[in-house]
Amino acid sequence: MDKFPLFPLPETDVFPGMTLPLFIFEERYKQMIKDCVDNDQRRIAIVLAKPQADISDVTASTHVVGSVTDILSVSENPDGTYYILVHGQERCRVGQVDNHSEPYFSIDHRPYKLERSDPNVEQITSWDALETFREYAKVFFAFDALKQIEEALPEELLYQASFICANIRIPAEERQILLEAPSLIDRLRYAQKLMRERIEAHEPSDEPSDEPSDDNTDTASDASSSEADDNADASLLN
């Protein structure tokens, strides 16, 4: 069975098709990236760390579902830190953890496939979620975000769901629920529910004007940016 290095990060979930730049400065994870480069290991598993958790106890401090990511690029800095870019693939279960031989953790590859159902039902569910997302964007994003959303929106339904989940402003624990959803339809419906709740809770006086405002996200593409344990700055889908 294949093994992947495990990278626990606070405030960070990775969905299929999502790209994520990471700054690696902690010694054990610098070693992890060096080993990946030396051994031509192009995949790592990223999992959400629980709030205020002791990362040294990885089984208690992380969620049981994470994501396998491909390392797209690695850039080493003169001080030995790294900038890397990863791309979300399939989700996985965090099972047996191994740290006997390395300063970082590794896990066995245990895929956790997302259930797929009737394509027509999935398509209709995606349309509904996208309509709600457009409403959500009008309330919470800058005035020109809708155009950028339409330009960046993927065609594949799985990636459309990832695009929505990565862009809505929700706590990491709720985003984790989206990642763990049993099926694509469940993921889309729960994302729609979260967006609808936030739209309905929004005060009318807080609605953005027709002009750009510093209080709103500048573009849809950075709406889910977050800073994680290694100063990770989350970007969205290609």
Predicted regions and their residues:
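N-terminal low-complexity, acidic/polar interaction/targeting segments
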Residues: M1-N238
